[in-house]
Amino acid sequence: MTKKFLFLMAFLSISVMYCFGQVNPQAPLELDKNVRYGKLDNGLTYYIMHNEKPAKRADFYIVTNVGAIQETPAQDGLAHFLEHMCLNGSKNFPGKGIISYMESIGCKFGENINAGTGVEQTSYMLNNVPVIREGIIDSSLLVLNDYAAYVTNDPKEIDEERGVILEEKRTRDTYQWRMSVAVKKAIFKGSKYADCSIIGTEENLSTFKPQELQNFYKTWYRPDMQAIIVVGDIDVNAVEGKIKTLFSTLPKAQNPKPKDVITIPDNKEPIISIFTDKELNATQVTLYMKNQPMPKEYRALGVSFLNTLMQKLISGMLNERLDDISKIENAPFLGAGTQFGAICNTMDVFLAGVQAKDGEGVTAFKALLVELEKAKKFGFTQDEYDRAKTNILRSFESAKENAASRQNGQLVQPLVSHFTSSWPYTTPEYDYTTAKAYLDMVPLVAINQSLPQLFRDDNMVVTFNAPQKEGLVTPVEKDFVDAIAYAKSAEIKAPVATVSNEPLLDATALKGSAVKKTAPGKFGTTVWTLANGIEVIVKPTEYKKDQVIIKTVSNGGKSILPVELLPSIEKNIFQIYLQNAGISKFSSTQLNKMLTGKVASAVPYLSQLEQGVLANGSPKDLETIMQLIYLNYTAPRCDAKEFEVGFNQIKAVLPNMMKQPDFFYSVQLQRAMANGNARMPILDNELISKISIDNIKKALGISFADAVGTKVYITGNVNLDVLKPLVEKYIGSLPVKAKKAAMWIDQNLDLPKGIVDKTFDFEMQTAKTTVGLVYSGLIAKNIENDILMAAATNVLDQTYTKTIREDEGGTYGVSVQGVISGLPKEDFYLLLHFDTEFAKSKKLIEMAKQGLVDISTKGPNVEYVTKARENLIKAFPEKQIQNGYWAGIVYEYYSHNKDNYTNYIETVNKIVTPENIQKFIKQMIDQNNRLDVIMNPKAK
């Protein structure tokens, strides 16, 4: 037995010591009885489950338990290439027949028709298929059947797809990708995993023989390696019969090739990886401790549940400590965290990582190691353990409460894990009961006794990743070896318990304000008008039992703030403030501990024209949510030292981020769209000098000191009788001072007029051209135009997929985004965005522009319009089982007098026509406002 196996054995011994006779860790876990599970004679596995969230929809999956790690050298990248080819011709769906058929019933490529290739497995999915006719179920299963054994792999189609995949590789070849390659070589040193890239080399993608692809397909795509999963609003018995009839015809493999089981060698001394890159944005050091995975024969037993539970407890307590340290003044690191996980079939890891200021990576790593040694030496305190247990059990409870609202995709993933990795598929109700039983029985001493087996000296890997820039000294391997030795000999003090039972506020001191008027509202809402003038619109739902969403809204926003305050509330800076702010007299670390076991959050927001508080949580914690909303208005926390902790993070990484092509491009795009308006601050190195906590405090004071004119939207599982007194107490106590509500100001934040070219060169390691074409102008904001914009972007998606992706092989994809604003002006912008090779860029840019011109003069492809219309019709009922959708519908109606729900389907059927799409696109491009933001690689 290797040392790597000892951690599991420690858990097994704990199981026997503390759990025997109450819950039996060696007994099988109870599988979800609602899943129909079976296996055909040819070896194919199937899972079927009935679910009506959403109604008349189903997900169809085929999972092949093989990924890129089984490729031969000549097949490098072909597992992923094959995934593409499954959509490029099969026995019953020649050419693009699968995509064409699925789009004809309202599904969308990329969203509902997709696939994913991993190192260990490959999955193909048809999501949210409208199973409104029996024939659609039959056809969806036929698609899976073709994936399983009847993909054409036509050499002509293969050659056409090479360019698409090479462009996908170009798009993915970022600093993150290069860093992941270096990390894999260290973690998997001495094994095939170290060189498994999934996407393959450019040389092999360009030159492989089609027969190699066919060989991979015929070797691995076979019934004994495949599972069919169908979850949705279907008849389980009927679907099982269809699967047996259709898939039993797949031939059983003769002399099937077994999968190679690839192990990772043990290492006695630490493996150290040092990687630098000019485009890397931060210094990161990560410690990996390699462990043997839970043997498959144990995964179906209670011990696997206990194992996972103890890992959650340990990482939760460690992360609380590390988070607290990161928020102190002069912290040794900017951020840190730990987690457990599987990174391949034959290895699990415990990892602990830190983000440091440039040049301080070794110091940060030492601080991290000291915390691990502290846990190993002294264990955790009882108050830490109690908080961790409470939070974990609350997460299980929330999952139990929301079990009935799970949508198909949430139900599919545990079934995939069961097939590929033998992890059991249990119910949230069973998980909650089991977790509670274990948490009630496993004492803190059991956790602390297991830590020495976790924090060992062998099988360690350390990865250091940092920016490569002048003047920054890169550490060497010895620095990290010395850091490990330092932590082991350091003088470490035992942790001190920190407990606070202080309430958020004295609720008895609030005077409140009674509901003076109650009226039935639109969409099943109830409208309360409080004596202080605040209007509360409540939409009770039961879509998620353990969720309530609250939004307070009043006019003004950034538009009424002095221009000198705006840099300090730029969206990224404001987010940093929120992450570190806390509330009232409580720091963020204190607040987190005070909210142990509660699902409650509330944060202020400032948009261009509005301000308010966004809150969400559990109905059980509704009073806490209301208290947080109240405190955001009356006691925002603006502590200079706490803000500086977060601000230091952005100051540390921003100069490096400006060297990343994608980030730099986004800055230039935002700057060009802002058109030089000082009221549109863009995060860059210059902006940093204009930011202060005092200006944040002033902005919050102006925005939240007076709640006059505020509307409050509450959506979710609320009882009006329970909610009403809380609204009267907390919303009724918000400060209302002025007689008249503020109004937003039109600050003329308009995009540039005319044809504007912003082309620039940028130094990058992987040469590519990034294109953004922004069309803009005036257009009426109404439901008809919103629908036409959604349909038009869909039509353009299909158009560019055909012309630029498939015909030219010029890009992995063209992103099309269209937005219509109603305030302060009724206007729009349409953004076309893609990456490509510099040599192809001019041609593709002209093709993108001409695509719009052709539609405006000749009309769109009629089939594309039909598919776009069907997609809008299909998507409409799917949204209606989500609280977020109804929160938006109610807000638009009561704040902007826009009804985006009533007669929606009728309107779609009426207006989504080729003629209207043609007119709509013509209306947009005829205004002759186009901003071209194009980044080319700087010549080396």
Question: Which residue ranges define each predicted feature?
Answer:
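Hydrophobic, small-residue-rich alpha-helical packing segments that form membrane-like cores
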Residues: E157-M225, I229-V231, V236-T245, P251-V261, ...
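Metal-associated gating/positioning segment near the N- to mid-region
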Residues: M85-F93
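Active-site His/Glu-centered metal-binding helix of metallohydrolases
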Residues: L78-C86, I314, F574
